[in-house]
Amino acid sequence: MWESKFSKEGLTFDDVLLVPAKSEVLPRDVDLSVELTKTLKLNIPVISAGMDTVTESAMAIAMARQGGLGIIHKNMSIEQQAEQVDKVKRSERGVITNPFFLTPDHQVFDAEHLMGKYRISGVPIVNNEEDQKLVGIITNRDLRFISDYSMKISDVMTKEELVTASVGTTLDEAEKILQKHKIEKLPLVDDQNKLKGLITIKDIEKVIEFPNSSKDIHGRLIVGAAVGVTGDTMTRVKKLVEANVDVIVIDTAHGHSQGVLNTVTKIRETYPELNIIAGNVATAEATRALIEAGADVVKVGIGPGSICTTRVVAGVGVPQITAIYDCATEARKHGKTIIADGGIKFSGDITKALAAGGHAVMLGSLLAGTSESPGETEIYQGRRFKVYRGMGSVAAMEKGSKDRYFQEENKKFVPEGIEGRTPYKGPVEETVYQLVGGLRSGMGYCGSKDLRALREEAQFIRMTGAGLRESHPHDVQITKESPNYTIS
């Protein structure tokens, strides 16, 4: 042990380049899909971080529509986080199998509240909560000129000539019915006229608009949620599972600690089929420990993030490329996967992270400036920025992430992150397009037809500081910013 203190050398993204190889594939033809687990498949290997200035329901919805995944942060109450997950799951479905409904005795106010809360344009009306026989529908058109919201729904709902379809109606069949009758919602009923589902024109349009969406077996967008290692973790997990979360992320600064291992084991024993991501770690030993405890996917990265100060405050970490490779080497032995979390500044770093052994990457700073992030927008020197902070910053720990850094009992915090601002970028769709485009280009240079080929066959070359300087634009003054290249 003593003799091996300085035996290893660590490499990060700026230390290496991928070597170009003979290619028979065009960038537009590469396959970017990846199976993180048997039941968790992404169409692009990009995940938004579970940070309180990066991912809430709006970001998670946008990421899933692009083919990726969003992780709802845990700096909120259990009920709020479960509600965020529910918003994602209800935002888009092929067939809504458990639609909201009201009864004729409810007030118009109840319909207005439900429609406003979930941003829906109508609600089926059933005779009562027990029988659930369809008797009408109320839409925003019915509410348009109503001033007395205490009226009963029975007085304003549409109940004549209701257009319905039987259970098992396909989306193509539903689209024809909706177009024929010029309506937006099609209730599905059984032979006793009981409400069994709902198909909306908006969901059909979204299927067409976002063909690459990441969805579960029921046609709903997929979403993950972060949890910690506090006393209420199992209660939080229970509520998230009830909200149909697709994956739980046990999110801590040091995943190779007994409390984290115990939590992983407890969740696995309670929910044998639940997808579990656990981290963060940076060594093969930690990866093995989490997998043996029950993790399906291991999250790799201690200190590489742009807003993280762990490496300088604590003096601990492993440069990210080396950490990814070491952890992936161990995960392969168990048939498990890893996520590279942190340190990615350009799209080329995504290609490097996946070639080093990652199955997907988790992004924070690259997405924090987009419209969908929950960070506040501010104006600085005439330009728009969004607030971005590490979960180890004082503000984030005060809000609820102190357990991530094992400081839940502290009255004063020792922060391992900072607060900052990042330029506003507009819709996340544009950012993801550029990032994925860079990945496609990199795979084309490497001759990799899919992500598995990139992991297995791509080769690295180490470069000097001079090589890094040569890699960036040099000897010119940039006069027009590129959408995929900015030096802060």
UniProtKB/Swiss-Prot annotation:
GO biological process: GMP biosynthetic process; GTP biosynthetic process
Coiled-coil residue windows: none
CDD domains reported in the protein's UniProt record: CBS_pair_IMPDH, IMPDH
Residues annotated for NAD(+) binding in this entry: 251, 301-303
Function: Catalyzes the conversion of inosine 5'-phosphate (IMP) to xanthosine 5'-phosphate (XMP), the first committed and rate-limiting step in the de novo synthesis of guanine nucleotides, and therefore plays an important role in the regulation of cell growth.
HAMAP family associated with the record: IMPDH
Name of the protein this chain belongs to: Inosine-5'-monophosphate dehydrogenase
